[in-house]
A protein has these predicted regions:
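Penicillin-recognizing serine hydrolase domain
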Residues: 1-15, 83, 113-264
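Active-site-adjacent loops and short helices of periplasmic peptidoglycan-processing enzymes
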Residues: 1-155, 165-168
Length: 264
């Protein structure tokens, strides 16, 4: 058990929570039960459904609609080429590392099958996991049909993050600074940089997922381990003080959390 005193200073996020991953002890929270849009942090649920399906070697063709979908909604893109055939694991990399909305569409379309069926599964899974203040209207967190139609809470997103991080294949991807996929039979070469600036810059950081829209602000689901202690947390609605606003909030929370004394 961690002995909690005070609070992290200078955190600007509208909603936040920091949790000891091993015990579930909440170390600090700000409006952790308030529903807010979480942008691309949504993609963690998309990944979880693919992981639960189990066959990461499944071959999936990138549909023509994936490109137009990402372009139409202004989403981050993994620059997937329609017609390319990639494995589910490679598409998870395209989803989680560069935060590709085209990858989200491709996976949702394959695993629904179809977008509507996949969204129904996302919401059913959230309900089954006890994420009572979470709702999905897209597999990627893009702001449609409205800016706030896909929403969650910091507490619910910790539940989601803990579930996803139980999968070694997920952990391995969200901890990468980049992903290099050489040209192969059926697909072009791809190079994807991780959108999470915590990776490689914060000692002990192991993920998890960034998000940003105008309405959601900067969002980050994060986890770090130091001296055998793992902390997981969320920031939602960090103001746009720069591209790494969510990272700055996360670093302040983690620095504070790791300094707390542990009882016994």
């Amino acid at each position: 058990v961690v002995e909690v005193t005070g609070a992290p200073g200078g955190v600007k996020a509208k909603g936040a929570v920091l949790v000891d991953a091993a015990t579930g002890q909440v170390l600090w929270a700000r409006d952790a039960g308030t529903e807010r849009p979480m942008a691309s942090v949504t993609k963690v649920m998309t990944a979880l459904l693919v992981l639960q399906a189990g066959d990461l070697g499944r071959q999936i063709r990138v549909p023509e609609a994936a490109f137009s979908y990402a372009w139409e909604h202004g989403g981050e893109s993994a620059a997937l080429r329609p017609g390319d055939v990639l494995t589910a694991q490679q598409l998870l990399a395209a989803l989680l590392v560069p935060s590709g909305a085209d990858a989200a569409y491709t996976l949702a379309n394959a695993y629904g099958p179809g977008l509507d069926a996949f969204l129904a599964r996302m919401n059913a899974t959230a309900a089954r996991m006890g994420m009572r203040h979470t709702h999905f209207t897209s597999p990627d967190g893009l702001p449609y049909p409205t800016e706030t139609s896909t929403y969650s809470t910091p507490s619910d997103l910790v539940t989601l993050g803990l579930a996803a991080m139980r999968y070694p294949a997920f952990r391995a991807l969200v901890d990468l600074r980049f992903y290099d996929l050489p040209k192969g039979p059926g697909h072009h070469q791809y190079w994807w940089d991780n959108t999470d600036e915590l990776i490689g810059s914060y000692p002990g950081a192991v993920g998890i997922k960034t998000g940003y829209t105008d309405d959601a602000g900067h969002c980050l689901l994060f986890e770090a381990t130091r001296n055998g202690q793992t902390l997981i947390g969320v920031v939602l609605g960090s103001p746009a003080t720069g591209p790494a606003a969510g990272v700055q909030d996360a670093e302040k929370m983690l620095n504070w959390g790791f300094r707390l004394p542990r009882a016994g």
